[in-house]
């Protein structure tokens, strides 16, 4: 049941429900007070029923001890306690019978405390067992009466009434007045609260408390000293008579100053000798006072020592750590460079902690939500611009930033060592680093190679972490660096829950590796990845758009063979054919068209592949697209002419017209045409060409202006002459696209398949077979533990019916294509050594059937032999069709067949 938000009143309302025996608690999570004091408020107990007790609605006329107005009342009483703390000992020692203004002030103060006694009967208290506010009036009264009620009442009795109650011999001592010092417990509670209040300095609160304790002790002692001298029968035999023989006639101020002087010299154990105890009573009191001073001095010195030591403890620990590190380095004879790195790192750590730059312990004590918000505020923009995370969702970046740790490193410090195990990678926030490649593990100037430099916003160590291989370089800081460290396990855990973003990260990494052609070690990693892609060992959603953007026709061919949708688009809405046409990659365009890519596909900006090829002068690609039925009418044809006008390209304008472009339509939202643009630019040549191709000189824009009117307003005489002399040409009609049935695949050039050449394929097959033979379990383990292995396994799980997360560009279309299409075709070379022809038997390239039985039946029909087994070229038996890969060479044999090497061995 929802409740309304309300503040706890000083005295709870009198409306309805009075007299209830039980505490009615209406709790709500919206009642949380922003003023809640963590030093005095009641914390809720654990469990679903434990929240909100401190915000309970109390009974009628019951005051919450945490109400702001009650706290102000207590703070006001503190001022009266300070008055009582000074006046009570003073009256006890110097004023036998208070009268006049002093007596009136005492009675006024007593009246305030009497009001507080009455109010206390209506103040709820915290139960020490349940830590809940108890608002039962009877329990409140019983608790108060059995604890501090008697002392509070006695301390409030007026002085005049107390003198009448006491016997005549004790009336002058004001014993009841001394009981008012009981109120000092309120000051102790105040200091305890201030010590926990973050608005006040703990150091100064403690200092003020110690000063107050010292002054109060000196003041009380001075008053007691004077009381002993004043009440002693022989005034000349007292401590004050040596300094002031007729002290009774001196002013009260002079007597008080003298008493304070002797009290403070005794407390400080100075003892100049001008004042000292004269009688037995003074000696006994002085002895007792000095014993008290021993404890008070120890208390003050101990507290001051703790305060001072606390401020210097960090420096002491730092010096001890530096000394220990230096001793360790010297004891084990470490190189000077390592010693310097150790000392620099420890010094930098001390400085960052002392200046509040890297309070790791404080940061770790915060809840995860607060830590994530802090990291997001500090580093989100930087991580968003890292090349590895270009194009990923903000959700992934937020998750990654939450797992990153900021660290400082001194100059010339090694962050990553070459060939060490990949555990973390780093993003540079500030500073710079150098990447060093060692030869044979020797660090000498003659064998060091500077592989590159890294600056703010760059990543180091990501290749080793993502590919799960030893680090390629040693990363060493050149200046003071602030780095973001990300653990490999945390990164892969996040990627597993964001497969679509993981694919983007993987593509970004592959693109980066391929661009770094000047570094041999990175080139080797890129080649290894390409080989694994070619062998089909990576089952993750690399898109056709990625392959087309890299111009990798072999990878594109492999992906198309797996059944990927040739019309899938990236996150910008561009298909692979758009990208291949824009890059002028004839081989990729041919492959896509052969596999059913739409030659007239349109991106969100209205561009078609033919336009991408035309505007970049890729004539061979243009011809391929035209032969496949492409034209410009499928896109936003009008803006094409405007581009030609702006570029002053008559040849491009002619191509636009020839391929079905529109030169007369509006090319922008304001209704302007390409002819408007030519007139505004004063380009008479382009205007004449447009008019020749059917542009309308009287087409109006949204303002009602025609190209002819614009020419007249601008006073372009040549332009007006062109309009006047131009004859009206009928617009050339765009060539209609051929029907779908008339579109045939692009013919093979010279009868050669447009997939990667057979020689190249054979070379790749042989090389990959050799590489596969050399593969070791360690390399396969590296692959499984790398980013590629994580994406592969996750993609396989999704493909088999597991969780289907969002894909990258065209992921949904590819998923539908995979679910509706048959398994990818596998081509194998088969031969039968037992057929006629002997060892010179010919091989035949066939599509692999779904079962081995089907393959044996196919071989029987081709070779005229009834084979019963399938073996590899190396003589290994094949028991399952799923073991066969594209490009394998298989032998179809009978049970009687013996491999040639075994036959020669038997002979």
From Swiss-Prot:
Function: Probable inward-rectifying potassium channel. Assuming opened or closed conformations in response to the voltage difference across the membrane, the channel is activated by hyperpolarization.
Residues given in the record as a nucleoside 3',5'-cyclic phosphate binding sites: 388-512
Disulfides per UniProt: none
Annotated ranges, domain KHA: 827-907
Intramembrane feature spans: 258-277
Membrane topology summary: Multi-pass membrane protein
Membrane-crossing residue ranges in chain numbering: 76-96, 103-123, 147-167, 175-195, 210-230, 289-309
GO CC annotation terms, alphabetical: monoatomic ion channel complex
Renumbered ranges of ANK repeats: 539-568, 572-601, 605-634, 636-665, 670-699
InterPro entries: Ankyrin_rpt, Ankyrin_rpt-contain_sf, cNMP-bd_dom, cNMP-bd_dom_sf, Ion_trans_dom, K_chnl_volt-dep_EAG/ELK/ERG, KAT/AKT, KHA_dom
Positions on the Cytoplasmic side per record topology: 1-75, 124-146, 196-209, 310-907
Keywords: ANK repeat, Ion channel, Ion transport, Membrane, Potassium, Potassium channel, Potassium transport, Repeat, Transmembrane, Transmembrane helix, Transport, Voltage-gated channel
Organism: Oryza sativa subsp. japonica
Molecular-function annotations in GO: voltage-gated potassium channel activity
Cell compartments where the protein resides: Membrane
Membership in a protein family: Belongs to the potassium channel family. Plant (TC 1.A.1.4) subfamily.
Notes concerning its domains: The segment S4 is probably the voltage-sensor and is characterized by a series of positively charged amino acids. The pore-forming region H5 is enclosed by the transmembrane segments S5 and S6 in the Shaker-type (1P/6TM) and contains the GYGD signature motif which seems to be involved in potassium selectivity. The KHA domain (rich in hydrophobic and acidic residues) present in the C-terminal part is likely to be important for tetramerization.
Record region (Disordered): 726-779, 801-824
Biased composition (Gly residues): 803-812
Official protein name in the record: Potassium channel AKT3
């Amino acid at each position: 049941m929802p409740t309304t938000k309300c503040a706890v009143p000083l005295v709870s309302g009198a409306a309805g429900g009075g007299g209830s025996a039980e505490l009615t608690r209406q709790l709500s999570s919206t009642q949380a007070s922003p003023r809640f004091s963590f030093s005095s408020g009641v914390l809720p107990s654990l469990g679903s029923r434990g929240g909100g007790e401190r915000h309970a609605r109390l009974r009628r006329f019951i005051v919450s001890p945490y109400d702001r107005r009650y706290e102000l009342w207590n703070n006001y009483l503190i001022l009266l306690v300070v008055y009582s703390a000074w006046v009570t000992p003073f009256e006890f020692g110097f004023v036998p019978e208070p009268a006049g203004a002093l007596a009136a002030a005492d009675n006024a103060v007593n009246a305030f405390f009497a009001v507080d006694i009455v109010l206390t009967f209506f103040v709820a208290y915290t139960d020490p067992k349940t830590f809940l506010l108890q608002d039962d009036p009877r329990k409140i009264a019983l608790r108060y009466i059995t604890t501090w009620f008697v002392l509070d009442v006695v301390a409030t009795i007026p002085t005049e009434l107390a003198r009448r109650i006491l016997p005549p011999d004790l009336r002058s001592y004001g014993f009841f007045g001394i009981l008012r010092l009981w109120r000092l417990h309120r000051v102790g509670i105040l200091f305890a609260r201030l010590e926990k209040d973050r608005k006040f300095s703990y150091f100064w609160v403690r200092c003020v408390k110690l000063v107050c304790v010292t002054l109060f002790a000196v003041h009380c002692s001075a008053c007691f000293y004077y009381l002993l001298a004043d009440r002693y029968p022989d005034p000349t035999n007292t401590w004050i008579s040596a300094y002031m023989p007729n002290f009774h006639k001196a002013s009260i101020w002079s007597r008080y100053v003298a008493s304070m002087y002797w009290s403070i010299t005794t407390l400080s154990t100075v003892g100049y000798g001008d004042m000292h105890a004269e009688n037995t009573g003074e000696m006994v009191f002085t002895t007792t006072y000095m014993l008290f001073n021993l404890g008070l001095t120890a208390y003050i010195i101990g507290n001051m020592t703790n305060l001072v030591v606390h401020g210097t403890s960090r420096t002491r620990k730092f010096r001890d750590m530096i000394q220990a590190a230096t001793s360790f380095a010297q004891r084990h004879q470490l190189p000077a460079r390592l010693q310097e790195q150790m000392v620099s790192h420890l010094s930098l750590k001390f400085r960052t902690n002392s200046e509040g730059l890297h309070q790791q312990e404080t940061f770790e004590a915060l809840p995860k939500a607060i830590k994530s918000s802090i990291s997001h505020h500090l580093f989100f923009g930087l991580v968003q611009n890292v090349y590895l995370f270009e194009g990923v969702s903000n959700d992934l970046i937020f998750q990654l930033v939450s797992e990153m740790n900021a660290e400082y490193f001194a100059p010339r410090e090694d962050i990553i060592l070459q060939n060490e195990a990949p555990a973390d990678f780093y993003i540079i926030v500030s500073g710079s680093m150098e990447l060093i490649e060692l030869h044979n593990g020797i660090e000498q100037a003659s064998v060091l190679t500077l592989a590159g430099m890294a600056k703010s916003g760059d990543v180091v160590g990501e290749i080793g972490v993502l590919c799960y291989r030893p680090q390629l370089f040693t990363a060493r800081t050149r200046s003071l660096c602030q780095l973001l460290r990300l653990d490999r396990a945390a990164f892969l855990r996040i990627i597993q829950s964001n497969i679509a973003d993981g694919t983007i990260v993987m593509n970004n990494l592959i693109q980066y590796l391929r661009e770094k052609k000047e570094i041999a070690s990175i080139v080797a990693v890129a080649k290894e990845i390409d080989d694994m892609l070619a062998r089909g060992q990576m089952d993750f959603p690399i898109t056709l758009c990625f392959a087309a953007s890299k111009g990798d026709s072999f990878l594109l061919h492999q992906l198309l063979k797996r059944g990927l949708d040739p019309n899938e688009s990236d996150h910008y809405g561009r298909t692979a054919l758009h990208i291949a046409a824009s890059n002028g990659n004839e081989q990729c365009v041919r492959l896509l068209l052969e596999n059913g890519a739409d030659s007239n596909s349109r991106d969100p900006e209205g561009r078609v592949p033919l336009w991408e090829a035309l505007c970049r002068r890729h004539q061979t690609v243009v011809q391929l697209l035209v032969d496949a039925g492409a034209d410009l009418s499928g896109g936003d044809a009008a803006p094409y002419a405007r581009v030609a006008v702006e570029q002053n390209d008559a040849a491009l304008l002619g191509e636009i017209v020839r391929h079905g472009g529109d030169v007369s339509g509006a090319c922008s939202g304001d209704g302007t045409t390409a002819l408007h643009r030519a007139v505004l630019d004063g380009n008479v040549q382009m205007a004449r060409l447009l008019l020749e191709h059917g542009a309308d000189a009287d087409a109006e824009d949204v303002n009602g202006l025609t190209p002819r009117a614009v020419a007249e307003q601008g006073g372009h005489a040549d332009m007006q002459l062109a309009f006047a002399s131009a004859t009206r040409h009928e617009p050339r009609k765009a060539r209609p696209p051929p029907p779908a049935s008339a579109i045939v695949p692009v013919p093979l050039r010279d009868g050669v398949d447009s997939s990667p050449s057979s020689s190249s394929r054979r070379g790749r097959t042989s090389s990959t077979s050799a590489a596969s033979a050399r593969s070791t379990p360690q390399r396969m383990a590296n692959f499984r533990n790398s980013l590629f292995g994580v994406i592969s396994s996750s993609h396989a799980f999704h493909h088999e019916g597991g969780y289907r997360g969002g894909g990258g560009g065209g992921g949904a279309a590819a998923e539908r294509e995979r679910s509706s299409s048959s398994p990818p075709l596998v081509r194998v070379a088969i031969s039968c050594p037992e057929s006629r022809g002997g060892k010179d038997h010919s091989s035949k390239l066939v599509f692999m059937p779904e079962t081995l039985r089907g393959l044996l039946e196919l071989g029987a029909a081709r070779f005229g032999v009834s084979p019963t087994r399938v073996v590899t070229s190396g003589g290994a038996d094949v028991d399952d069709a799923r073991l066969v890969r594209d490009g394998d060479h298989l032998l179809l044999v009978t049970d009687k067949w013996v491999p040639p090497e075994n036959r020669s061995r038997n002979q």
